[in-house]
Amino acid sequence: MTERKAAAPRGPYGAWFCLLVALALEVVRVSSNHDTLDPIYLPVALELLDAPEHFRVQQVGHYPPANSSLASRSETFLLMQPWPRAQPLLRASYPPFATQQVVPPRVTEPHRRPVPWDVRAVSVEAAVTPAEPYARVLFHLKGQDWPPGPGSLPCARLHATHPAGTAHRACRFQPSLGACVVELQFPSHWFSQSATTRAELAYTLEPAGEGPGGCGLGTEEEPREQALPVGGVELHPEDPPQYQEVPLDEAVTLRAPDVPMRPGQLFTATLLLRHNFTASLLTLRIKVKKGLQVIAARPAQPTLWTAKLDRFKGSKHHTSLITCHRAGPAGPDSSPLELSEFLWVDFAVENSTGGGVAVTRPVTWQLEYPGQAPEAEKDKMVWEILVSERDIRALIPLAKAEELVNTAPLTGVPQRIPVRLVTVDSGGALEEVTEHIGCESANTQVLQVSEACDAVFVAGQESRGAKGVRVDFWWRRLRASLKLTVWAPLLPLRIELTDTTLEQIRGWRVPGSAEGQLEPETAAEEVERRSRGCRLQYQRAGVRFLVPFAAHPLDGGRRLTHLLGPDWLLDVSHLVAAHAHVQDPRIASLEGGRILVGREPGVTSIEVRSPLSDAILGEQALAVTDDKVSVLDLRVQPVMGISLSLSRGMSHPGEVTATCWAQSALPAPKQEVALSLWLSFSDHTLAPAELYDRNDLGLSVSAEEPSAVLPAEEQGAQLGVVVSGVGAEGLPLHVALHPPEPCRRGRHRVPLASGTAWLGLPPLPTPVPALPSSPVRTSPFTEATVEGKRQIAGDMGGHVGIRGKFERAEEEAGKEENEAKEEEEDEEEMVPAPQRVTDLELGMYALLGIFCLAILIFLVNGVVFVLRYQRKEPPDSATDPASPQPHNWVWLGTNQEELSRQLDRCSSSGPPKGEGGCPCESGAGGDASTVAPSASESPAGSSSTLARKEAGGRRKRVEFVTFAPAPPTQPPEEPVGAPAVQSILVAGEEDIRWVCEDMGLKDPEELRNYMERIRGSS
């Protein structure tokens, strides 16, 4: 039992040991995953010019792209309006170098051929007949406005391909609408006498020429393979009827043409009569407004009916009364319900129709029978005739774009697409419609339309996007639809930080605010004040605001269509930077919406709030800690020029990818070189020097040859030098990073880090045996070191100091001695930035720490065990005279025979009456020295045995055994059946009173006899 108790405390420590081992393995795994540093790229500025609406895009988790390096950078742009008025340019700049290129034309389906214009082609007719053998196609230029002159607009040539041959015709875009119509007549031999055939339409764009209409004559050869498709047109053998039938009553039906009428045109309306009509007299009253008149009424069957026309002119209406009499009975073989023509009414349209605008002319028809009221309203029917000077064939809406990116929820600024309605006439004439227009959006949760029907827009309240959302337009009896694609942002925003934990940079202090301080009187006080005004420098991080855009299905499904793809995000930093802020500006601040600056330790977040409401569009937590990191090295890339390459993407017509890289040609004499700097920190993060304020960067450059380099003009955060000449082996430039000049005191005069850049090709490395304890990494671009007390000339705030690396003047040597003394007097010594710890070293350190902790836990467990059981010794022998103190042992038992025997002894030998009471009650009546000897008088061991009756009738026996230092003079004789216990009662009478009372011995004589028996047995 003792062994189990001792082993029990080891259980929790074993569990903790297993947990720590698992934690060590996890540390090794995480360190292996953290092997690669943050991605690095050439911090060249890329911007699009003359592109009003564009976005930077990136793939999820791929910024910068994989092909970026210290000497190159790639960026992808999305142009939502790829054909602006001016040709868009992409400019790349890294002072003092800059270059630009024209964005290549858009690549269109299906042949992936670049075209310079975004053209929408709409086929007006779906079918043609020999009576109207004309196929009309409207071409419209989308995108931004174009120059007002017609010289820059191209021609569109329509090609028709039929099994019987080909035909083509061209039109030139007009500057007013940016549209034109091609009316192509099909040859008569293309039409079949019995079957319907099909002709395929396609178009090509060509520069304007000197032919009719400004376009070339073209050739009769087959259309080129690069032609873009328009659609197909069916060629019917005969002209289908175009009329409508309206019943005037149960027996008479009106059949009228369903086409617009032109001024001066004649047309005929026909009345049909059922064969079961039995009346012999029929009167037809026709009322027309001015501009339309009835000129004749002719019976279709003169042998059955006669017709008489009477005309009456009024101030507003002209009334014509036609009286029809039956001349003979109907044929016996005709069906009773069959309709047959019985009256033809001829109409004429007057020449004046109101300036060429289409108008409607109402015609009221009323049938009268004998015995019927002449003005019965129930028999009146109004039929409207559309009259126009133009032969209008279609109503077509023209939109600047067919795709809209809804950024209104992010900016609060509505997005609009202008829309213009035009009519297409026979002959190819176009005319804009501006009045009496109706419009309606089929889904207001996606897209809305203005009251004037001149634009579609999104205002920020829309909840979703969609592809092919429809907007309906109507004018008079003509209707048209416009389908667009709306991309909506999928909130919340993704706020991407290059580093979410900003730490204090060891040894780097920058000037702080000195407000409220008095001007110093001497130069020494100025230096002291400036040194006291320096504050800690924390890391900085770049910020990007990203969001995916998607279109929802119109049928209410959940499958989304993403812009560019599900793994592409749009950079909306230029849109939401004004609405972004740090929740606690004391901890960090956001400079320009793009750079996060740490201020003091704490935890906060970056929030972007909606400009339309108080809702949070996106949030990202960040922390600023007082943990210190070191600048391990500087990664330096010399830039002697930049090159740019542009390419079109395949995911979207407006996708453009720009790749820029630094030129590494050998520098010519007086060649200006810019140095791109990246700071590598001990927390495995990288940051370009452009993130930091140029006044906080103390940079210096040194060369082996004093006259090799000269300082260049300031170019912002970049470091520039002028190279006077270089040998064939290349020229190394050593760049060092210092704190600003006002904060260089003592240890802060030592460079924080340094790096080496090779101009041209670096020399071949000399094989040198490397020490095992100091591995050296080489790179073709940088050779980074952390310098100790190397003397490098430099100025504050990005100014460049140039000196020879091995040039040492006497005054400089004295200055070095003075600076060394100042550093010795400084309390804090500059700690060189440690080299980067490898993953193997991290794992070994973690395992070593785990083993040390396990050994410590084992030692603590042993000490606790010893302290807990050092006083618990096994019982010594009763004859051991060396035992310094007694040991009390308790024995629990239920020996019923022993308890009964003791009770019988007490009851059989009671004390005589009149004797004294229980000896435990007083000291009289007994020999005190015999009953309770003291420890000094009786060194023998003593014991007492007590028995008490339990509630259930079962007695327990409790033995108290005391081992004395010396054994008794005589061993006791134990009764048969009783436990062999050597016991002597050593307590006083007052101490054992409870024993007497519990055994039922009330009489003093009985108690005295019981005590004597106990002494005798002992």
Curated annotation (Swiss-Prot):
InterPro entries, alphabetized: Ig_TMEM132_2nd (IPR055422), Ig_TMEM132_5th (IPR055423), Ig_TMEM132_6th (IPR055424), TMEM132 (IPR026307), TMEM132_3rd (IPR055421), TMEM132_C (IPR031436), TMEM132_M (IPR031437), TMEM132_N (IPR031435)
Basic and acidic residues bias spans: 807-818
A GO cellular component entry from the record: endoplasmic reticulum membrane
Keywords: Endoplasmic reticulum, Glycoprotein, Golgi apparatus, Membrane, Signal, Transmembrane, Transmembrane helix
Positions of the UniProt region annotated as Disordered: 807-833, 900-956
Extracellular side: 33-846
Biological process terms in GO annotation: negative regulation of protein catabolic process; positive regulation of Wnt protein secretion; positive regulation of Wnt signaling pathway
Glycosylation sites: N276
GO terms, molecular function: protein homodimerization activity
Keyword ATP-binding: no
Residue ranges of the TM segments: 847-867
Membrane topology (UniProt): Single-pass type I membrane protein
Location(s) in or outside the cell: Golgi apparatus membrane; Endoplasmic reticulum membrane
First-listed, main subcellular location of the protein, grouped into a coarse class: Golgi
Subunit structure of this chain's protein: Interacts with HSPA5/GRP78.
Protein name per Swiss-Prot or TrEMBL: Transmembrane protein 132A
UniProt source species: Mus musculus (Mouse)
Chain's gene name: Tmem132a
